[in-house]
Regions:
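A short, polar/acidic, helix/strand-boundary loop motif
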Residues: 1, 226-260, 297
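Active-site palm subdomain of RNA-directed nucleic acid polymerases
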Residues: 1-41, 45, 267-283
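Conserved pre-motif C helix in the palm subdomain of viral-like polymerases
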Residues: 1-13, 103, 128-152, 251-262, ...
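Catalytic palm subdomain of template-directed nucleic-acid polymerases
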Residues: 18-56, 66-74, 290-303
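RNase H catalytic domain
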Residues: 23, 69, 264-331
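Short, conserved micro-motifs composed of acidic
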Residues: 61-88, 328-332, 337-349
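C-terminal reverse transcriptase regions that engage the nucleic-acid substrate
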Residues: 87-201, 206
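Acidic, metal-ligating active-site segments
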Residues: 205, 209-237
């Protein structure tokens, strides 16, 4: 109903209606502006449009105190300095751990609920226990994907050993799981800037995607590199994606896994450019000269597996965007091998 109402108002408020429809998720609206005046104009217009159909926008939240002051009225619910992603469960609303600290304007994590869940059963974990805990990690952007990947690789080992759902994990896997959960408190230190530095005056806007693969997993990680008007560059982690490789009997060769990581990188390019609507200068990096050779040549030369993936990669990206990076300088190495929280947080390359 409200979408039909907004479409009717599009001729009168084209910019605001477009922003709302583009950034509305169920009943949560996430938007922004370059300055306080523009933010207030968007917020007030949105409030008035929804008021026409008796829908009140509330729970206003902003990293700008001046914007919040304009909505600190009795009819509005008081804003807090943290926006938590929650879901409804039998026990009530539970924080999934990802939050936005508006005072410092960073995306951060609260692993306390994971730590408490791990303490409830310190030893004798079953496959069900491990999967239950790891599935509670809510990291849609993949900011801590190497940590989650390490858990998933351990799950695969449990499957390979034929461990039943309620069967105890072998001692070596139990010890590995214990080390992972013991390091979860380090996730408190993950703080990623919400604003990546883009503005109407920032140029150029670079997107760098790194990809890598190992026999256990493959993945890609994306960074934004922005040059401000003062000539300084700002580099921020945007997102990442990891995947565990198939079981050994169905596992492709390592060069083909490297090509799969390039495909994953290309898909991330499409996702980010579509979502941000920014004219990025894209550069894709891989440490596999074989995969780069496949991408840079005519796909018709290769067999079906390689040909299909090269077609997809070159349909999304240009072959000239792809460059080689030494393996030791590739941050996506963490996406292909996994890392505990204790190793990921201090890793400068991430």
């Amino acid at each position: 109903m409200f979408k039909k109402h907004l479409e009717d108002l599009r001729p009168e408020f084209p910019n605001v209606v477009g922003l709302i429809l583009d950034q509305l998720y169920v009943d949560d609206l996430l938007g922004g502006a370059d300055d306080t005046e523009a933010a207030l104009a968007i917020a007030n217009t949105a409030k008035d449009m929804f008021a026409q159909i008796k829908m009140k926008l509330h729970k206003w939240l902003s990293n700008c105190p001046d914007v919040l002051k304009c909505f600190q009225e009795p009819q509005h619910e008081p804003a807090t300095n943290i926006l938590k992603q929650v879901v409804s469960t039998d026990a009530g609303a539970k924080a999934l751990g990802v939050r936005w600290d508006t005072k410092s304007d960073v995306v951060c994590f609260d692993p306390s609920y994971l730590i408490e869940a791990a303490k409830q059963k310190p030893t004798g974990h079953t496959k069900r226990d491990m999967l239950r805990l790891s599935s509670r990690i809510f990291d849609p952007l993949g900011l801590i994907s190497p940590i989650v990947l390490e858990m998933r690789m351990l799950h695969q080992q449990l499957w390979a050993k034929g461990v039943q759902w309620d069967g105890a994990a072998p001692p070596e896997l139990e010890a590995a799981w214990q080390k992972i959960t013991d390091d979860l408190h380090h996730v408190h230190n993950v703080r990623v800037p919400r604003w990546i530095g883009t503005s109407t005056s920032s140029t150029p806007v670079e997107l760098h995607i790194f990809c890598d693969a190992s026999e256990k997993a493959y993945g890609a990680v994306v960074y934004g590199r922005i040059r401000n008007v003062d000539g300084h560059f700002t580099v921020n982690l945007l997102c990442s994606k990891t995947r565990v490789t198939p079981m050994p009997e169905k596992r492709p060769t390592l060069p083909r896994l490297e090509l799969l990581s390039c495909e994953l990188a290309a898909r991330l390019v499409k996702t980010i450019t579509t979502a941000t609507k920014i004219e990025w200068q894209v550069t894709c990096w891989s440490d596999s000269k074989v995969a780069l050779g496949w991408i840079r040549r005519n796909p018709q030369r290769w067999k079906q597996f390689v040909r299909n993936r090269v077609f997809l990669i070159t349909n999304i990206t240009c072959s000239s965007w792809w460059r080689h990076v030494p393996g030791l300088e590739n941050p996506a190495d963490l996406c292909s091998r996994g890392a505990s929280a204790g190793k990921l947080i201090p890793a400068a390359i991430w």
